[in-house]
C-alpha cells in the first residue's frame, strides 16, 4: 500500500506526488529504476491532462520526481532543462514550513486553466504562441493597445510572467552566492506579484473564501521582515 503526508486538494501537488510514485514503482518493477525522473514527470503530466482532464503544466511533476530544490527551463517542453540547486536551509538557520489553511484546490480546474490561456491570448496578440517569446519592451510599449482585447487580468498576468522569469534566475544566483537575505527578498517579491498580478491566491468566483489570503496575512504578522 501507499501512504503519504501530502495534504489532498490543498495545492501541494498531491496528484503529481501520486503520479510520481506510480511511475517510480513501474520503473523499479520493469526497468531496474533506470527511467529518467523527467520522463516519469512527463508521463504523469500526460496522465493528468488526458485521463484526469486537468490541463496542468510540468512543474509540479518535475518537483516531485526529480526532488530537492530545482530550477527548470520549459523553453523546449519535450526536453525541459532541469538543474538541482544545492542549498541547505538549515545552514542559514531557516526551515521551510507548510501551513494547512484548510483551503481546497480540488474544484478550481477552470480557474487554473485560465492562467495559461490568458497568457497565450496576450502572446497571440503579438503573433507568438507563448508569452516568453514576446519582447518585454514591445509589450510595455503597446500595453494600452493590448488592453483593448478586453481582459485586464490577462495583461496583469503577463506583467507577472515577465518579472517572475527574471526573479527565478536572481533567486538561483542568490542561493549559489550564499545570499539568503536577497533570496528571501526575491521570494517575497514573487509572492506579492502572484497575489497582485498573477491573482492565483483566491478565486474571483468565490471571494468569501480566502483561507490562503488569511494564512499569508497571519504569516506576515508573525514573521514581519524576518
Where do the protein language model's features map onto the residues?
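C-terminal nucleotide
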Residues: 71-226
